[in-house]
From Swiss-Prot:
Keyword Endoplasmic reticulum carried by entry: no
UniProt name for this protein: Poly(A) polymerase type 3
Subunit structure: Monomer.
Coiled-coil residues: none
Matches recorded under InterPro entries: NT_sf, PolA_pol_cen_dom, PolA_pol_NTPase, PolyA_polymerase
List of residues binding ATP: 97-99, 106, 110-112, 164, 225, 234, 243-244
GO biological process per UniProt: mRNA processing
Disulfide bonds: none
GO MF annotations, alphabetized: ATP binding; metal ion binding; poly(A) RNA polymerase activity; RNA binding
PANTHER family: POLY A POLYMERASE (PTHR10682), POLY(A) POLYMERASE ALPHA (PTHR10682:SF9)
Principal place of residence: nucleus
Amino acid sequence: MPFPLASQGSQQSQKTYGITSPISLATPKDTDCTLTQKLIETLKPYGVFEEEDELQHRILSLGKLNNLVKEWIREISELKNLPQSVIENVGGKIFTFGSYRLGVHTKGADIDALCVAPRHVDRSDLFSSFYEKLKQQEEVKDLRSVEEAFVPVIKLCFDGIEIDILFARLALQTIPEDLDLRDDSLLKNLDIRCIRSLNGCRVTDEILHLVPNIDSFRLTLRAIKLWAKRHNIYSNILGFLGGVSWAMLVARTCQLYPNAIASTLVHKFFLVFSKWEWPNPVLLKQPEECNLNLPVWDPRVNPSDRYHLMPIITPAYPQQNSTYNVSVSTRAVMVEEFKQGLAITDEILLLKAEWSKLFDAPNFFQKYKYVFYNLLAMFAWGEIINKNKKRCYTLKKKKK
């Protein structure tokens, strides 16, 4: 697996990425390359890099799934009596998004996938005939559908790989192989569930188009994701940041230091976001107007958007804040972690510490000793409430 140990050349400095000029156009020194190699060696034991044979297995499995989709769409087209000329070129395609599409998935990670179909294929077709087709495949295990979810999904294990499949029906007669989902015009005449399903691919692809050096971005993101997980701040549900938010912060760092490599970018990440003046938003590009009347993040128009504490705005239309769950307390925790990360990477760059120090897991009970007792109190109080509920219910039954 190739890793970036040097800049891509002076041409990178000719283009401005993001909404501001770069902070620095400095190119890597020998020490930066050495530190980047040490970073790679430090990351390896944590399983953040997949072996080549595992990667090829994923590619092969996705290819099989893609062929199944094409075959299924042809069958649906025949059942709906489309002309033979259309059936022969009807297409259909599986796109990936999330960590796999970004190129930062870890060993054994699942794959987020999107099934894109032409206009005559309904979502109900996916959850009926395609679901039945999947059932018949010997590679498919643990098949289940969640049709009524906020974003409807089919979950399965395909040849040992866990895959989540979303669905989007485009207003096109056929789906070409070279379809670019970043094209905003594809959103016209789509229902909201299709737009939500498309959003993951559109955001992921846009991020990759907005960084100056994809290899440096990927290695930096692997390091930051591992650091966030080790420090227990990788969770959108708990009010911290999820995968796409971390990716956008790393992408913004890459835009500000377009010629830097991973060892420098990890340090600059902590430098930038330990000093960021929240709630100023993090933007990878200026929001675009598409006149499709979809709700977008805009504090000038939407009063509720003004109360977001740590806005990180997705770069694809319709732009959304990916961190709406962040609270005052979780933001304070993250900012403190950024400051500690900066202090450690300062030491690493001065050759006074090793990369392993950055990924040392903090002692939870030393750091949050009072939270433990509060949780015990909450559990105890919950038991009292549950017992009282049962008692009240029993009394009501007796009275009857």
